[in-house]
A protein has these predicted regions:
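C-terminal substrate/ligand-recognition segments
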Residues: 105, 354-471
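Conserved, well-structured interaction surfaces
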Residues: 39, 44-58, 80-162, 174-182, ...
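An aromatic- and glycine-enriched ligand-binding surface/loop that stacks and positions planar moieties
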Residues: 20-85, 192-193, 206, 210, ...
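Bacterial Sec-dependent N-terminal signal peptides
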Residues: 1-29
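Short coil/turn linking the two alpha-helices of tandem helical-hairpin repeats
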Residues: 159-160, 164-166, 202, 222-229, ...
Length: 507
């Protein structure tokens, strides 16, 4: 045994004696600020890379999990052997998460990664002579203003999630945490400072004056919650300025689908102040599809994506089909039956027009012969309903287990593959028509500004003013013969605190 130990020691000593002591690396090539920026295209690419990161931060993972799954409209149930993930979704649902959750880490890391990228690009741009690349000083100021806007946009998540966060504007310096008020004041001052340097109505996927003004609206609307100081007057003034066209010309789309099909066949909704343009195989909203779609939805929606069958709308009905009586939740049944959005999603033409916002009930195969709609062939499940019709239900329970399953009750851990209606607010259009993953994802809509201004007026006691603003948007959701019944201005007593919250949820 001793001899064996000595052999090991000698072997290790031999490795040490022959190890390299010169640890300086030999660099054969590298990309630095000095050699990357060769032309104006390189500068533009560096700028838009920050938007790509912003989309990733804003439209996947942490934002949905921390802001939506913790609320009462969306859920990610355990579906038999699928989706428990160590209980992380259950803890979000029950508000029992810990600081060790991946979502909490990502809620901190993703925005700060975006901030670091902004700071790095800002440092590059501030030290570049744009005229060398035949770009004007005005263009340089615009690009820098966009990066500062994106940096604040990332801070919007941080102040909402954590309140106390470092204000980081330098790529070298490590900062201590700042107070919520300090973070708020930094965000506000940055946005106000860059407004004049941005154009109006810039177009798709870029911040402009209205985009920055809209972020200020969000900032002021949430100020009381974030810093304990009411800023509703400032919110009202900024929102009204946007509606008055001070920062660009926008209008409410007459078609409720318009903002969400922007980008299809060249259509651009005038309602979208800021939208992220996506394109299949180049820049995709993959998480938005996969997280909420069933594995078999590809056969009804016409695409070749698998889907994860993760989440769905929170249920409106109990195990026996009765409506829940809770004030919160029940997102599907919060839509009146006369609301034209409350329909099963269905493509109705060859050019990608569709109706409805929900996958619900029995699922049927896409009609390739017509190029839209469905055939009579039923799609079948693969888990609890393997070989049986896939029928989405607005309930949570182990129905496939009969009375034994019902006895378990309705709980987030007792889902099945068909549990929950699926929201398709962002339409997944036919791949065979080259429309799949081609519609933009709207980050800021003019409707949000109308509703923010309405909230300010409602809080100040001007219910009629609030009702008119809400009605200006929601009139498109009802047939003319039904509108008088649902107009808030005509039925002002219906506009209560609870109804206002429900209407915000529907929009």
């Amino acid at each position: 045994m001793k001899k064996f130990k000595y052999i090991i020691v000698l072997f290790v000593m031999g490795l040490i004696s022959f190890s390299c002591t010169d640890l300086d690396e030999e660099i054969f090539s590298e990309i630095t600020t000095d050699n990357y920026y060769q032309n104006s295209n390189n500068i533009y690419a560096a700028l838009v890379n920050n938007y790509a990161k912003a989309f990733s931060t804003g439209w996947s993972d942490a934002r949905y999990f921390l802001q939506e799954v913790t609320a009462d409209q969306l859920m990610i149930p355990t579906r038999g052997k699928h989706g428990y993930n160590g209980g992380e979704y259950v803890r979000l649902h029950e508000h029992k998460w810990t600081v060790e959750e991946n979502f909490v880490y990502n809620g901190w890391a993703a925005p700060f990664q975006g901030i670091a990228l902004c700071n790095n690009t800002l440092s590059d741009f501030e030290n570049l002579d744009f005229s060398t690349f035949k770009l004007t000083e005005e263009t340089k100021n615009e690009y820098i203003a966009e990066l500062r806007a994106l940096r604040v946009w990332n801070y919007m998540f941080l102040i909402d999630f954590f309140r106390h966060v470092p204000i980081v504007t330098d790529i070298e310096e490590v900062k201590a945490q700042s107070t919520p008020l300090e973070v708020f004041n930094f965000m506000e001052s940055e946005l106000l400072a860059i407004l004049p340097d941005l154009p109006k109505n810039r177009g798709v996927s870029r911040f402009d004056q209205a985009g920055v003004a809209s972020i200020l609206v969000r900032l002021y609307l949430n100020a009381e919650k974030w810093i304990g100081i009411s800023k509703y007057d400032e919110c009202e003034q900024m929102a009204q300025a946007i509606l008055d066209g001070k920062y660009g010309e926008y209008s409410i789309d007459s078609d409720y689908r318009g903002p969400f099909r922007s980008g299809i066949n060249g259509y651009r909704s005038k309602e979208n102040i800021m939208e992220f343009a996506i394109k299949k195989n180049y820049f995709e909203a993959s998480w938005l599809y996969n997280m909420w779609m069933h594995y078999q939805d590809r056969y009804s929606l016409d695409n070749d994506w698998q889907g994860w069958n993760g989440g769905n709308l929170a249920p409106s009905r109990d195990l026996y089909g009765n409506l829940y009586q809770d004030k919160l939740g029940m997102p599907f049944e919060k839509f009146p039956d006369e609301d034209i959005r409350k329909k099963a999603f269905r493509v109705i033409s060859n050019d990608g027009y569709y109706e409805g916002f929900f996958l619900m009930g029995t699922q049927y195969k896409f009609d390739y012969e017509k190029g839209y709609g469905f055939t009579d062939e039923v799609i079948t499940g693969t888990e609890e309903y393997n070989g049986k019709p896939l029928v989405y239900v607005d309930q949570v329970g182990r129905f496939s287990e009969g009375e034994t399953g019902l006895a378990k009750g309705s709980h987030v851990i007792y889902g099945e593959e068909n549990t929950g209606y699926r929201l398709i607010k962002f339409p997944w259009l036919p791949q065979s028509k080259d429309l799949f993953q081609m519609n933009s994802i709207p980050e800021i809509r003019l409707a949000e500004i109308y509703y923010s201004l309405a909230e300010c007026k409602y809080r100040s006691g001007d219910k009629i003013g609030a009702a008119r603003l809400l009605d200006a948007v929601r009139k498109r959701y009802y047939k003319a013969e039904d509108w008088s019944k649902f107009s808030y201005e005509s039925n002002i007593s219906k506009l209560t605190d609870d109804e206002f919250v429900d209407e915000l949820g529907r929009e």
